[in-house]
Swiss-Prot record:
A GO molecular-function descriptor: BH domain binding
Entry's induction text: Expressed in the early phase of the viral replicative cycle. Expressed in the late phase of the viral replicative cycle.
Motif BH1 in this chain: 76-95
Recorded GO CC terms: host cell endoplasmic reticulum; host cell mitochondrion
Gene3D superfamilies to which the protein is assigned, alphabetical: Blc2-like
Result of changing residue 85 to A: Complete loss of apoptosis suppression
Name of the protein: Apoptosis regulator Bcl-2 homolog
One of the Pfam families matching this protein, by short name: Bcl-2
Domain of life assignment: Viruses
Positions of short motif BH2: 126-141
Major subcellular site: host cell
Length: 179
């Protein structure tokens, strides 16, 4: 990697990969950079709010299931707007999915990290850079109020639940040989 691509790689590692590795206990809090420790605060707050609202469960036993479920949820999440709050929801969702895979001992957490990395690189990074990059994300994380966090969590949940409900309906129709 060289030049601009290396800069983008570093941004994604700072914002996304570091938090996921911390969340799944692959690295300790002391191994986080000062920047990562700052954004960890808002992401932990998002995670706590999300946990109070709903228990997210996954059924992930293959690389294809991870890619399908992940892509479905995050595409729905960002289909009409990208903002820092939704990016926080995306990061927390990615971390939860990776932790599920690690806890299930199915050795697929690296697939989640790679899928999240690629989605951020190709779909979110251009927006992030045009909206101030790491500095603006840090400013957002330091100055978010409870209302905006709750609003973004509720929006994320509505998109997640809509996607999962749709998948459940499709599966039910398939089970009944209706499609």
């Amino acid at each position: 990697m060289e030049g601009e691509e290396l800069i983008y790689h570093n941004i994604i590692n700072e914002i996304l990969v570091g938090y996921i590795k911390y969340y799944i206990n692959d690295i300790s809090e002391h191994e986080l950079s000062p920047y990562q420790q700052q954004i960890k605060k808002i992401l932990t707050y998002y995670d706590e709010c999300l946990n109070k609202q709903v228990t997210i469960t996954f059924s992930l036993t293959s690389v294809q299931e991870i890619k399908t479920q992940f892509t479905g949820v995050v595409t729905e999440l960002f289909k009409d707007l990208i903002n820092w709050g939704r990016i926080c929801g995306f990061i927390v969702f990615s971390a939860k999915m990776a932790k599920y895979c690690k806890d299930a001992n199915n050795h697929l957490e690296s697939t989640v990290i790679t899928t999240a990395y690629n989605f951020m690189k190709h779909n979110l990074l251009p927006w992030m850079i045009s909206h101030g990059g790491q500095e603006e994300f840090l400013a957002f994380s330091l100055h978010s109020d409870m209302y905006s966090v709750i609003f973004n969590i509720k929006y994320f949940l509505s998109k997640f639940c809509n996607h999962m409900f749709f998948r459940s309906c499709v599966q039910l129709l398939r089970n009944c040989n209706l499609i």
